[in-house]
Amino acid sequence: HYKKAILIGHDWGAPICWNTAALKTKFISAVVGLSVPYTRRGKISSTELWQKLYKKRFFYQNYFQKHYIPERELEKDLYKTISKVYYWCSAEGFINRIKTTSELDSGLLDGIPMPKGKLKWLKESDILKSVLEFKKSGFKGALNRYRAQNLDWKQLKVLDNLNIIQPSIFIAGEY
């Protein structure tokens, strides 16, 4: 049983760590956020903001708000999904300016090509492990994290008046 913790979070884990540190100062002694900086709670929820900003073109977080449609797309061919998403998120994908399609009614994977050959930084066994895990769990749990943003925004009004007071650091990379 521990009395204090240091939190480290990447991507979705970063805002969860930042907010936990702000809410639980007695228990969190330091916090590290990777890729996503600390931001205060906005006047509108992030999903409402995304819907306004991306009214006429595709944005993955808006797409993930739909129920069942993203799950069907992502779970149709797990190997293809995992390969495309890892490539899309890689430095090579970024350098090649891989983007999802900008058509409003498209799916996430529509604008992402399959990588040409094997990814240099990822073993085939790692892709297959991810395929097996998502075959068991599906994508609903991961997508529900995106769908919970409005609920978080409504229930965490207390964050309006809180700051990160612990030692903290934000780390980002170029690619």
Describe the predicted segments one by one.
Residues 1-8, 12-175:
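Flexible "cap/lid" subdomain of the alpha/beta-hydrolase fold that forms the substrate-access gate
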